């Protein structure tokens, strides 16, 4: 399927406080964020024109920047308003929302404390890609070569651009080998997450998922755990060794893009997508639908 290059699209991007035409949203090639990874971002989705968990994402966006030793010069409320504006201005109902912040081009060295902090928000069309029955076939995951870093070595709780380098490498390798994605281990060889989503397993009716201490405790992950508990499903957060995968019944991943997606294989391990996966696919789909007051607020923009 042909995908229109992102630099050739139309619409508006919010950049440093103002809406600008898509093709005018540019940064200098000597921006510090490009060379030294002083950059963080968010991944969000709008359903029916309303951004799901917008405030939680804005709060994490600012926290991520603080962990990278810079401050986003907008409040949570200003970021929420800017995101809603750019969704409405582009006329999307179901779309992906990408806030990003980076150090600018005033300084080009490891230290760049006087570089301007730039912020942009872009959106693009992103409908739900699969129906429930298609999802229930499950995807296949490779096991990544690279591991999530020790929290003593990197700000693992930040959605920092630099931390995605090994994710890109791992997903490229997985796709070349015929897989949809890759499961990553942590620095001690235990199960961690996928390249852009959290991973959960089911055994004897309970969900088991790794403790989120060296990777993002995803907003979707938190939502899905809450939904599982609300439906009477026990959730156990613990250390999981790779060899334990042989004993799990179901496996699924969750994230902004993935939503809730069952897994049929992780390397040599096989799973059968089942009722808990189905229940959470349906519960999450209901949870993301905007309420009447949210729709009214979006219309008033």
Where are these regions (language model features)?
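Short, acidic/charged, Gly/Pro-enriched secondary-structure junctions
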Residues: 79-107, 124
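Helix-start/capping segments and mature chain N-termini
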Residues: 1-85, 110-301
């Amino acid at each position: 399927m042909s995908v229109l290059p992102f630099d050739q699209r139309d619409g508006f991007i919010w950049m440093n406080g103002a809406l600008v035409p898509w093709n005018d949203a540019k940064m200098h090639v000597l921006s510090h964020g490009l060379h030294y990874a002083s950059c963080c971002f968010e991944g969000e989705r709008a359903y029916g024109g309303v951004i799901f968990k917008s405030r939680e994402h804005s709060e994490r966006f600012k926290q991520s920047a603080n962990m990278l030793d810079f401050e986003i010069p907008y409040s949570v409320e200003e970021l929420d308003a800017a995101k809603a504006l750019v969704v409405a201005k582009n006329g999307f109902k179901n779309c992906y929302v990408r806030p990003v912040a980076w150090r600018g081009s005033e300084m080009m060295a490891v230290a760049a404390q006087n570089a301007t902090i730039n912020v942009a928000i872009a959106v693009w069309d992103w409908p739900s890609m699969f129906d429930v029955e298609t999802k229930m076939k499950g995807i296949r995951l490779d096991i990544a070569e690279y591991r999530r870093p020790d929290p003593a070595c990197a700000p693992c709780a930040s959605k920092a651009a630099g931390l995605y380098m090994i994710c890109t490498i791992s997903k490229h390798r997985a796709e070349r080998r015929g897989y949809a994605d890759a499961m990553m281990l942590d620095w001690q060889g235990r199960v961690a997450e996928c390249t852009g989503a959290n991973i959960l397993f089911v055994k004897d009716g309970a969900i088991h998922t790794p403790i989120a201490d060296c990777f993002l405790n995803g907003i979707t992950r938190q939502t899905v755990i809450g939904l599982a508990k609300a439906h009477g499903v026990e959730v156990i957060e613990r250390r999981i060794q790779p060899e334990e995968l042989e004993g799990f019944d179901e496996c699924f991943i969750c994230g902004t893009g993935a939503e809730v997606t069952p897994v049929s294989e992780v390397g040599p391990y096989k799973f059968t997508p089942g009722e808990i996966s189905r229940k959470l696919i349906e519960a999450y789909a209901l949870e993301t639908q905007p309420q009447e007051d949210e729709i009214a607020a979006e219309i008033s923009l």
